[in-house]
Structure formats: C-alpha cells, structure tokens
C-alpha cells in the first residue's frame, strides 16, 4: 500500500510513521509513505496557495491551481490512485471503509487548511470524501492520519497478530468487550471472577454479553443497527 499525503505541513504527519506498528510496516515494505506540498506546484509569487473567498466570508481558502497541478501530477504518475479529501462536510469514516480501502494499492489524502479547499477541486478530483467526526480541526492532517492508521492495520502483515482484528470494536457491529490484565485486584477493584477460572467457552459467552451491554449503553445508535436475531438472543 502506498500512502501519499498532499499537505502544507509534512512535519505534522511524518513523525507518526517513525514508531511502533506503522514504523515496522514501513520497514517491512507493507506500506510506503510519501508527501507532496502544494506550494511546490503554485504559480503564485512567494509560494502562495491561499486566497480570500469570492462572495465574502471569514478566512482564506486553498486556491484551486496549486492543488489541481499537484493532483494532476500524482494522477499522471499513477492513474489508479484513489484520491480522498478530508472535510467536516462529508460522511463519517468507519471500520467498513477502513477494511474496504485496505484493498487499494495507492491512496492519496488531500489535507485542507485555512477555511478549507475550493469546492471545484473536490468535485474535479475526489474519489471519496470523509470526515472523522462532528467537530472542526485546524487542518486535514489529523483526520488523514486517522484514516491511514485504520486502513493500514487492515493490510495483511501489518499487525503481528491477525486475530487482533477479529475481536476489535465494530468488527461484528459491537463495541469490544472490556479487557483486564494483572494484578487481579487493583486499588480495591477486582477482575471479573469468571475471567480467572480458565473456562474459555464461558469467557467468550461472558465477553459477548458484556460487548452487547457496552454497545447498548455507549452507542445505542449502533445497537439499533444490530440484526434483530442477535439482539433477541442477547436480551433473553
């Protein structure tokens, strides 16, 4: 998988791939990470990439020309690149999207700044547009990193233990059940006793029940989307 970040601030993104799981993924050639700065493609003086909005409005927008030339170059080098824009005015990214996009060979994340990007560029170049939640960030870099991380961990060989994916939140429509480690008692709080008895069949059943309870409490929206037969089985 190749990730290309179109960003004015490479140094905000690059360090994330220098440690832990994603650093190993880069080292093992599971992912390749590249950065392109639209300033390198602007025709304006002083590497200008922003301009005031037509029709008024607070703040500046990223101009169309630098981004257009940047994306044109990327597309010429790889016609199959999948171009993703990050903006709060889009659908929320989810785990299903992460698993689907893990099948791509090259994803380009376009990271907006200022008050956003000239809409014509989004319409011309976007294969998909995502947001990471109902809130505003100062730029698209953090959102792009969220997507890249979620996608990368679904690429074969990136995680050391592939079973980790199967039991994570959202894999079956539920939040992940609570987990515990040593010591058995911490500050007067006990690990659920059934977890200590070694009966893995009972532990699986209990974890499933706890996952249902957790989802129903914290994410009733997800719980309502569960298949009726799954909810009925839990509620009996």
Swiss-Prot record:
<feature type="binding site">
    <location>
        <begin position="132"/>
        <end position="137"/>
    </location>
    <ligand>
        <name>S-adenosyl-L-methionine</name>
    </ligand>
</feature>
<dbReference type="InterPro" id="IPR023148">
    <property type="entry name" value="tRNA_m1G_MeTrfase_C_sf"/>
</dbReference>
<feature type="binding site">
    <location>
        <position position="112"/>
    </location>
    <ligand>
        <name>S-adenosyl-L-methionine</name>
    </ligand>
</feature>
<comment type="function">
    <text>Specifically methylates guanosine-37 in various tRNAs.</text>
</comment>
<comment type="subunit">
    <text>Homodimer.</text>
</comment>
<protein>
    <recommendedName>
        <fullName>tRNA (guanine-N(1)-)-methyltransferase</fullName>
        <ecNumber>2.1.1.228</ecNumber>
    </recommendedName>
</protein>
<comment type="similarity">
    <text>Belongs to the RNA methyltransferase TrmD family.</text>
</comment>
<dbReference type="InterPro" id="IPR016009">
    <property type="entry name" value="tRNA_MeTrfase_TRMD/TRM10"/>
</dbReference>
<keyword id="KW-0963">Cytoplasm</keyword>
<dbReference type="GO" id="GO:0052906">
    <property type="term" value="F:tRNA (guanine(37)-N1)-methyltransferase activity"/>
</dbReference>
<keyword id="KW-0808">Transferase</keyword>
<dbReference type="GO" id="GO:0002939">
    <property type="term" value="P:tRNA N1-guanine methylation"/>
</dbReference>
<dbReference type="InterPro" id="IPR002649">
    <property type="entry name" value="tRNA_m1G_MeTrfase_TrmD"/>
</dbReference>
<dbReference type="GO" id="GO:0005829">
    <property type="term" value="C:cytosol"/>
</dbReference>
<dbReference type="InterPro" id="IPR029028">
    <property type="entry name" value="Alpha/beta_knot_MTases"/>
</dbReference>
<dbReference type="Pfam" id="PF01746">
    <property type="entry name" value="tRNA_m1G_MT"/>
</dbReference>
<keyword id="KW-0489">Methyltransferase</keyword>
<dbReference type="InterPro" id="IPR029026">
    <property type="entry name" value="tRNA_m1G_MTases_N"/>
</dbReference>
<keyword id="KW-0819">tRNA processing</keyword>
<keyword id="KW-0949">S-adenosyl-L-methionine</keyword>
